[in-house]
Amino acid sequence: SNSYNVICHQTKTAPEIHKQIIDTRYQWSAFVHGSGTGGTIEGVRRYIDANNLRTKVCLVQPAEENHGIQGIGDGKDFLFNPDNAHKIIQIKTEDAIFKAKSFAKETGILVGISSGANLLAAERLVEAISPSGIVVTMLCDRGERYMSVY
C-alpha cells in the first residue's frame, strides 16, 4: 500500500471531479467506489472531508465471501477504513459481470468486473436515494483482462 496513492487522489483526482461538477452547477451527492488498496476512495474521502463537502462516500464490496470481483474486497482494509464509508453497497459477482458486459454493449467501452460493480452500485444508490446532485464512480479496470469470463 503506497501512501502516495492516497495523496495523488486527494490532490489531483478529487479536485478535478469537484471542478467538473461545480461547472455543472449541481452538487456532488456521492462518490461510489470499491476498495482494492484503498488509495482512490481514501484520497477522495480526505478531499471531501477537508473541503467540508456534504458528499457521501459509499464503499462497494462483493456480496459473497468467495467472489470473483478481482481488485476489490479481498478482506484487507489497506489505506481505507470501511468505518469511514457513509454506506456500504454489496454487489454479487454475477451482477457485476452482467453490468460490465451490458455497459460494453451499450457504450463500446470494455471495462472489468470491478468497474461493473462500481457502475451497478452507483445505479442502485441513485435508485434508492434519488439524489438531487451528481453521483460519481470510476471505471478503474480494463475488460480485456476478463475476456475468458465474458
Annotate each PLM feature.
Residues 46-113, 128, 149-150:
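Active-site/ligand-binding loops adjacent to catalytic centers
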Residues 27-34, 55-63, 134-140:
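Beta-strand segments within the central parallel beta-sheet cores of soluble alpha/beta enzyme folds
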Residues 1-3, 111-113, 119-134:
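Structural signature of the thiamine diphosphate
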Residues 78, 123-150:
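Phosphate-binding loop/pocket of nucleotide- and phosphate-handling active sites
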Residues 1-4, 35-39, 61-66, 92-93, ...:
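Glycine-rich beta-alpha junction loops
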Residues 34-45, 114-122:
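Short glycine/serine/threonine-rich phosphate/pyrophosphate-binding segments
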Residues 1-35, 95-109:
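Active-site/ligand-binding-proximal alpha/beta "capping" segment
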